[in-house]
Swiss-Prot record:
PANTHER family the record matches: MAJOR FACILITATOR SUPERFAMILY MULTIDRUG TRANSPORTER MFSC
Membrane-crossing residue ranges in chain numbering: 4-24, 42-62, 69-89, 93-113, 131-151, 158-178, 217-237, 247-267, 271-291, 295-315, 333-353, 358-378
Highest taxon of source: Bacteria
The name this protein goes by in its record: Multidrug resistance protein MdtL
Pfam families registered for this protein in UniProt: MFS_1
PROSITE patterns named among the record's database cross-references: MFS (PS50850)
Membrane topology, from the record: Multi-pass membrane protein
UniProt lineage: Bacteria, Pseudomonadati, Pseudomonadota, Gammaproteobacteria, Enterobacterales
Length: 395
């Protein structure tokens, strides 16, 4: 079992590393490529577009051909794309590399969640996804620090050499450590209970959890996107104060994420999901009424705690009904989360909504809709919580 957890964690970490590692070198990259920082900031959207593109195909391929081939190819694409970015001499080539980086990271991301669905029952899966969320929160804090240390002695290209090395390591883990987890075809007596046709992506329970996770990701990405404006322009923080504040909020996320597995031993998943949305609602109301920086910071802290306590549980529930189509389900969740959050941020910008109101709006909207869905759509107990995986006995 340890091999599956190790490989899943490594596969997921390519996604945040690809976002955060290069940011510290952005001014120097812009200067060398004769582009403005504003022009290169689109690299974030291009990276997410690459992820969404990969997710369109990676899930179905993983269900048909296996998790392992997709993981190996995804890591290889990420590695080669990182080298392409390091060799870029102008902006368009750099953005092409960023898109391909997203493709590689997106394929690995989908496979990681499919592997966890294949190998863990619902209770353990919720705990592991919460831990995974906590580990993911470490990357936005450590990656810029590592990037800064690298650039003290080496040029910005070294950042992408480092990411390329990460791709190589993940590829080697996928090749030599990861074992295939795609479930074997079921006996005829089992087909009525679990078949690709029966595991529909349009059933009410999956759609409800897809909506909850998409709204939750929209909350956290809106927070990340709006945080520079809120903290440095509205609240008057310096760059150093901003970095410290974001590190502290990431610390809150880590503590809550690592505590959630223990909470799952005491409370039902539904209770933790309601607590998560209650924290979002409280955060939205706090920010709307805040008149001091202290109160505003308290509201921002509630956002991080709310996301960490509920997201892993909701993702586990969303993947629960799928054994033969875990890859497709994981892809669908990823696409909805990336596209849904990007759409909200884009619409808010087009409509001229301020950073604070953008954040308050998604917090209150997410919490109300999610609470209604949690109460109105319960898990389907006719679906087995865990499917036996023939490969598990070999771990």
């Amino acid at each position: 079992m340890k091999r599956f957890l190790l490989c899943s964690f490594a596969l997921v970490l390519l996604y945040p590393a690809g976002i955060d590692m290069y940011l510290v070198g952005l001014p120097r990259i812009a200067a060398d490529l004769n582009a403005s920082e504003a022009q290169l900031h689109i690299a974030f959207s291009v990276y997410l577009a690459g992820m969404a593109t990969a997710m369109l195909f990676a899930g179905k391929i993983a269900d048909q051909s296996g998790r392992k081939p997709v993981a190996i190819v995804g890591a290889l694409v990420f590695m080669m794309a990182s080298l392409l970015c390091s060799r870029a001499s102008e902006g368009s080539l750099f953005l092409s590399g960023r898109f391909l980086q997203g493709v590689g990271a997106g394929g690995c991301y989908v496979v990681a969640f499919a592997i966890l669905r294949d190998t863990l029952d619902e209770h353990r899966r919720a705990k592991v996804l919460s831990l995974l969320n906590g580990i993911t929160c470490i990357v936005p804090v450590l990656a810029p620090v590592v990037g800064h240390l690298i650039m003290l002695r080496f040029p910005w290209q070294s950042l992408f050499y480092t990411m390329s090395a990460m791709g190589i390591i993940v590829g080697l883990l996928s090749l030599f450590i990861l074992r295939e987890t795609r479930p074997a075809r079921r006996a005829p007596r089992d087909l009525s209970r679990s078949s690709p046709a029966a595991e529909s992506l349009v059933n009410r329970f999956f759609v409800s959890r897809l909506a909850i996770t998409t709204l939750s990701v929209s909350v956290i990405l809106t927070f990340v996107n709006a945080s520079p404006v809120l903290l440095m322009e509205v609240m008057g923080f310096s760059r150093g104060d901003y970095a410290i504040t974001m590190a502290l909020t990431a610390g809150v996320s880590m503590v809550v994420s690592f505590s959630t597995p223990f909470a799952l031993g005491l409370f039902k998943p539904r209770t933790l999901m309601l607590v998560s949305q209650g924290l979002f609602l409280t955060a939205g109301m706090t920010l709307s009424l805040a008149h001091t920086n202290t109160v505003t910071l308290f509201g921002l802290t509630l956002i991080c705690a709310g996301f960490s306590v509920g997201f892993g549980v909701a993702m586990s529930q969303a993947l629960g009904p799928f054994s033969l189509r875990a890859g497709v389900a994981s892809s669908t969740l990823g696409i909805a989360q990336v596209c849904g959050s990007s759409l909200w941020i884009w619409l808010a910008a087009i409509l001229g909504i301020s950073a604070m109101n953008m954040l308050i709006g998604i917090l209150i909207g997410c919490s109300i809709v999610s609470i209604l869905l949690i109460f109105s759509v319960a898990p389907n107990r006719s679906v087995a919580e865990h499917e036996e995986i023939p490969y598990q006995s070999r771990s």
